Swiss-Prot record:
It is found in: Cytoplasm. CDD domains: S1_IF1. PANTHER family: TRANSLATION INITIATION FACTOR IF-1, CHLOROPLASTIC. This is Translation initiation factor IF-1.
Length: 73
């Protein structure tokens, strides 16, 4: 990814698991966003449940959607 398209890394807490592999995540320094699990998380069957702390990557073009890249222990 070029510098212009680099995502914004933030942390948050999963509030709700939605249909279709989507999650509602409350970002620490901001609003609630819709996020999905990254491909590697799906591949290795990493489960994400409400209450989990996660790292998100937000698109600079749409700050209301993101990709979950890491689930904290």
């Amino acid at each position: 990814m070029s510098e212009k398209e680099a995502g914004i890394e933030v942390q948050g807490t999963v509030e709700e698991a939605l249909a279709g592999g989507m999650y509602r995540v409350k970002v620490d320094q901001g609003p609630t966003v819709l996020a999905y699990a990254s491909g590697k998380m799906k591949k290795f069957h990493i489960r994400i449940i409400p209450g989990d702390r996660v790292k998100l990557e937000l698109s600079p073009y749409d700050l209301t959607r993101g990709r979950i890249t890491y689930r904290d222990k």
